[in-house]
Amino acid sequence: MATSRGDDLLPEIVVVTGMSGAGRSTAARALEDLDWFVVDNLPPALLPTMIDLAARTRGAVPQIAAVVDVRSMAFTEDLLSTVEDLRSRGIGARVVFLEASDETLVRRFESVRRPHPLQGDGRLTDGISRERELLRSIRGEADLVVDTSQLNVHQLKAKMVGFFGKARETRLRANVVSFGYKHGLPVDADLVLDCRFLPNPHWVPELRPLTGQDEPVRDYVLAQRGAKEMLDSYTEVLRLLVSGYQREGKHYMTLAVGCTGGKHRSVAMSEQLAARLRDEGVEVNIIHRDLGRE
């Protein structure tokens, strides 16, 4: 929660730092999914300025996560003094330190074929050792130390949700997008449903000017052979997906529902599927991408 202080609302602060390759970016994405305002590679000295700017929004930015990449002793000292100063002002600043074993870090860097940022012309292990020494004092002052050696991406995200999330924030959110195949598939779809096997209301004169949001079109589409069976079958599939996505720490999914033009069948069926997803506890946003695009 943001802290009230005079006329201002001071945000809650989390500083995410630690060893390169230990999962800072993954932790930051998890916080972003929890609606934290995430700032990457922020110099520690600028953190108080960021907090003051957030306070002027009067609560619009209640939580800030600053990802700090400490690559020099000067940055290390800046971070420690900045956190100490914030705490002396009564601002709840917590430091999360991510680490992993040397063996794990070597394996991760080798898998992506990238040098360690402090490696220079030396060996990978030299860079890891140098960084570990630079960060020793920060690790000692951290509020939370997370060893990611045995964690995969999903498990680390789940840990961050456990530390900083609320029950309502862990619900899956779904975009249900109706579209017309003649305009192209949505590029971000996790699952695509094809409604073109259903008779097209376009060929019914009194339905042609209407859309799938209109009751006559909806009733016509749902009355067709196979429509209810399709909805029931995909509801079961979506139930499995929702459970699996939540178990793996996925917070968003995009379900695309297509017909020829994106005006009748896909619109009606996407509305029905969205309602069923809501019944499963999913937060749903409906987008009729090609509606009105003749």
From Swiss-Prot:
Keywords: ATP-binding, GTP-binding, Nucleotide-binding. One of its GO terms (molecular function) is GTP binding. ATP binds at G18, M19, S20, G21, A22, G23, R24, S25. It comes from the Bacteria. GTP binds at D69, V70, R71, S72. Gene3D superfamilies: P-loop containing nucleotide triphosphate hydrolases. It holds the Pfam family PapZ_C. Displays ATPase and GTPase activities. PANTHER family: RNASE ADAPTER PROTEIN RAPZ. NCBIfam families: PRK05416.1. HAMAP family: RapZ_like. Belongs to the RapZ-like family. This is Nucleotide-binding protein Tfu_2020.
